[in-house]
Protein backbone atom coordinates (compact mmCIF):
# COMPACT_ATOMS: atom_id res chain seq x y z
CA UNK A 1 0.00 0.00 0.00
CA UNK A 2 1.16 3.52 -0.85
CA UNK A 3 1.33 5.92 2.07
CA UNK A 4 3.26 8.57 3.94
CA UNK A 5 5.87 8.09 6.62
CA UNK A 6 5.44 10.09 9.83
CA UNK A 7 7.86 12.54 11.37
CA UNK A 8 10.75 10.10 11.93
CA UNK A 9 12.85 8.02 9.57
CA UNK A 10 12.17 4.26 9.52
CA UNK A 11 14.60 1.56 8.38
CA UNK A 12 13.67 -1.47 6.28
CA UNK A 13 11.97 -4.50 7.79
CA UNK A 14 9.98 -2.73 10.49
CA UNK A 15 6.32 -3.24 11.30
CA UNK A 16 4.46 0.07 11.08
CA UNK A 17 1.07 1.15 12.38
CA UNK A 18 -1.29 4.03 11.76
CA UNK A 19 -0.78 6.98 14.07
CA UNK A 20 -2.95 7.20 17.17
CA UNK A 21 -6.42 8.67 16.72
CA UNK A 22 -7.35 12.03 18.23
CA UNK A 23 -9.70 10.07 20.48
CA UNK A 24 -12.62 11.39 22.54
CA UNK A 25 -12.71 14.82 20.88
CA UNK A 26 -13.54 13.22 17.52
CA UNK A 27 -15.66 10.33 18.79
CA UNK A 28 -19.42 10.31 19.49
CA UNK A 29 -19.88 13.65 17.71
CA UNK A 30 -23.48 14.56 16.95
CA UNK A 31 -24.77 15.63 13.55
CA UNK A 32 -25.19 19.42 13.32
CA UNK A 33 -28.50 18.98 11.49
CA UNK A 34 -30.55 16.18 10.00
CA UNK A 35 -29.03 14.78 6.80
CA UNK A 36 -31.18 13.09 4.17
CA UNK A 37 -30.27 9.83 2.47
CA UNK A 38 -28.41 10.48 -0.77
CA UNK A 39 -26.40 13.42 0.57
CA UNK A 40 -22.59 13.48 0.53
CA UNK A 41 -22.06 16.52 2.78
CA UNK A 42 -22.31 15.89 6.52
CA UNK A 43 -21.72 18.44 9.29
CA UNK A 44 -20.86 17.30 12.80
CA UNK A 45 -20.29 18.93 16.19
CA UNK A 46 -16.81 18.02 17.42
CA UNK A 47 -16.00 17.73 21.11
CA UNK A 48 -12.67 19.57 20.87
CA UNK A 49 -9.30 19.75 19.05
CA UNK A 50 -8.77 21.85 15.93
CA UNK A 51 -8.60 20.21 12.49
CA UNK A 52 -6.37 21.32 9.62
CA UNK A 53 -7.72 21.47 6.07
CA UNK A 54 -8.07 17.95 4.62
CA UNK A 55 -6.52 16.34 7.69
CA UNK A 56 -9.17 13.64 7.38
CA UNK A 57 -9.18 13.47 3.56
CA UNK A 58 -9.15 9.81 2.41
CA UNK A 59 -9.99 8.87 5.97
CA UNK A 60 -13.33 7.75 7.37
CA UNK A 61 -16.48 9.15 8.93
CA UNK A 62 -18.73 6.51 10.43
CA UNK A 63 -22.04 6.52 12.26
CA UNK A 64 -21.36 4.70 15.51
CA UNK A 65 -24.75 5.04 17.22
CA UNK A 66 -28.44 6.00 16.89
CA UNK A 67 -30.05 6.85 13.52
CA UNK A 68 -28.02 5.64 10.56
CA UNK A 69 -25.62 3.62 12.71
CA UNK A 70 -23.39 1.13 10.92
CA UNK A 71 -22.60 3.33 7.92
CA UNK A 72 -18.97 4.13 7.06
CA UNK A 73 -18.10 6.80 4.47
CA UNK A 74 -14.74 7.75 2.98
CA UNK A 75 -13.99 11.46 3.27
CA UNK A 76 -13.14 13.41 0.12
CA UNK A 77 -12.41 16.89 1.49
CA UNK A 78 -13.10 19.39 4.26
CA UNK A 79 -12.03 22.86 5.38
CA UNK A 80 -9.90 23.78 8.39
CA UNK A 81 -11.69 23.84 11.73
CA UNK A 82 -11.11 26.06 14.78
CA UNK A 83 -13.08 24.42 17.56
CA UNK A 84 -12.97 27.48 19.83
CA UNK A 85 -14.63 29.52 17.08
CA UNK A 86 -17.25 26.98 15.97
CA UNK A 87 -17.69 23.36 17.03
CA UNK A 88 -19.22 22.36 13.69
CA UNK A 89 -17.31 21.15 10.63
CA UNK A 90 -18.65 19.84 7.32
CA UNK A 91 -17.20 16.87 5.46
CA UNK A 92 -17.77 16.01 1.81
CA UNK A 93 -17.72 12.24 1.31
CA UNK A 94 -17.21 10.12 -1.80
CA UNK A 95 -20.32 8.01 -1.26
CA UNK A 96 -23.94 8.93 -0.70
CA UNK A 97 -25.47 8.48 2.72
CA UNK A 98 -27.71 5.41 2.52
CA UNK A 99 -29.77 6.04 5.67
CA UNK A 100 -30.77 9.49 6.93
CA UNK A 101 -29.20 11.04 10.03
CA UNK A 102 -30.84 13.03 12.81
CA UNK A 103 -29.31 15.43 15.32
CA UNK A 104 -29.16 12.47 17.73
CA UNK A 105 -26.92 10.46 15.39
CA UNK A 106 -23.40 9.95 16.72
CA UNK A 107 -20.41 9.97 14.37
CA UNK A 108 -16.66 9.40 14.70
CA UNK A 109 -13.57 10.22 12.64
CA UNK A 110 -10.49 8.27 11.57
CA UNK A 111 -7.62 9.61 9.47
CA UNK A 112 -6.33 7.59 6.53
CA UNK A 113 -4.43 4.70 8.16
CA UNK A 114 -1.52 5.33 5.77
CA UNK A 115 -1.36 9.12 6.18
CA UNK A 116 1.47 9.30 8.75
CA UNK A 117 2.62 5.84 9.81
CA UNK A 118 4.96 5.19 12.73
CA UNK A 119 7.08 2.26 13.86
CA UNK A 120 4.68 -0.05 15.70
CA UNK A 121 5.29 0.64 19.42
CA UNK A 122 5.28 -2.12 22.01
CA UNK A 123 2.01 -0.72 23.38
CA UNK A 124 -0.65 -0.67 20.69
CA UNK A 125 -1.96 2.79 19.74
CA UNK A 126 -3.30 1.79 16.32
CA UNK A 127 -3.52 -1.20 13.97
CA UNK A 128 -0.46 -2.53 12.16
CA UNK A 129 -0.76 -1.56 8.48
CA UNK A 130 2.38 -2.93 6.84
CA UNK A 131 6.14 -3.42 6.81
CA UNK A 132 8.82 -1.14 5.37
CA UNK A 133 10.85 -2.67 2.53
CA UNK A 134 13.48 0.10 2.30
CA UNK A 135 14.85 2.80 4.58
CA UNK A 136 12.35 5.67 4.54
CA UNK A 137 13.00 9.34 5.22
CA UNK A 138 10.72 11.20 7.62
CA UNK A 139 7.56 12.62 6.02
CA UNK A 140 8.25 10.95 2.64
CA UNK A 141 5.81 8.88 0.61
CA UNK A 142 6.45 5.27 -0.32
CA UNK A 143 5.19 1.70 -0.37
CA UNK A 144 4.42 -0.48 2.64
CA UNK A 145 4.19 -4.24 2.16
CA UNK A 146 1.00 -5.88 3.42
CA UNK A 147 1.16 -9.38 1.93
CA UNK A 148 3.61 -12.05 0.81
CA UNK A 149 7.26 -12.70 1.77
CA UNK A 150 9.00 -9.92 3.72
CA UNK A 151 12.12 -9.68 5.87
CA UNK A 152 10.94 -8.50 9.30
CA UNK A 153 12.80 -7.67 12.52
CA UNK A 154 12.50 -10.59 14.93
CA UNK A 155 12.13 -10.48 18.72
CA UNK A 156 12.78 -13.74 20.54
CA UNK A 157 12.47 -17.24 19.12
CA UNK A 158 9.87 -17.83 16.44
CA UNK A 159 8.88 -21.17 14.89
CA UNK A 160 8.75 -22.29 11.28
CA UNK A 161 5.21 -21.90 9.83
CA UNK A 162 4.01 -20.50 13.16
CA UNK A 163 1.94 -17.32 13.41
CA UNK A 164 3.61 -14.07 14.45
CA UNK A 165 2.23 -10.91 16.04
CA UNK A 166 3.72 -7.49 16.70
CA UNK A 167 6.24 -7.60 19.52
CA UNK A 168 5.42 -6.24 22.96
CA UNK A 169 9.13 -6.02 23.74
CA UNK A 170 10.78 -4.47 20.68
CA UNK A 171 9.21 -1.70 18.60
CA UNK A 172 8.76 -2.61 14.94
CA UNK A 173 9.45 -6.32 15.45
CA UNK A 174 7.41 -9.51 15.31
CA UNK A 175 7.35 -12.25 17.92
CA UNK A 176 5.80 -15.69 18.19
CA UNK A 177 2.10 -15.79 19.04
CA UNK A 178 1.70 -16.62 22.73
CA UNK A 179 -1.86 -17.83 23.20
CA UNK A 180 -1.84 -16.76 26.85
CA UNK A 181 -0.67 -13.19 26.22
CA UNK A 182 -1.41 -12.56 22.55
CA UNK A 183 -4.60 -14.52 21.87
CA UNK A 184 -6.48 -11.40 20.82
CA UNK A 185 -3.58 -9.63 19.09
CA UNK A 186 -3.45 -8.90 15.37
CA UNK A 187 -1.74 -11.84 13.61
CA UNK A 188 0.59 -10.37 10.99
CA UNK A 189 1.59 -13.54 9.16
CA UNK A 190 3.32 -16.91 9.25
CA UNK A 191 7.04 -17.70 9.50
CA UNK A 192 8.66 -18.92 6.26
CA UNK A 193 12.27 -18.98 7.50
CA UNK A 194 13.59 -18.51 11.04
CA UNK A 195 16.46 -16.20 11.91
CA UNK A 196 17.82 -15.32 15.35
CA UNK A 197 16.38 -12.70 17.64
CA UNK A 198 17.38 -9.13 16.62
CA UNK A 199 17.86 -10.41 13.05
CA UNK A 200 15.34 -10.36 10.20
CA UNK A 201 13.26 -13.47 9.52
CA UNK A 202 11.26 -14.19 6.38
CA UNK A 203 7.56 -13.76 7.13
CA UNK A 204 4.59 -14.40 4.84
CA UNK A 205 2.56 -11.29 5.63
CA UNK A 206 -1.24 -11.38 5.87
CA UNK A 207 -1.82 -7.80 7.01
CA UNK A 208 -4.08 -6.71 4.17
CA UNK A 209 -4.81 -6.91 0.45
Predicted regions and their residues:
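Short conserved beta-strand and strand-loop elements enriched in small hydrophobics
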Residues: 58-65
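Extracellular receptor-binding modules and their adjoining Ser/Thr/Gly/Asp/Asn-rich linkers
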Residues: 1-53, 65-209
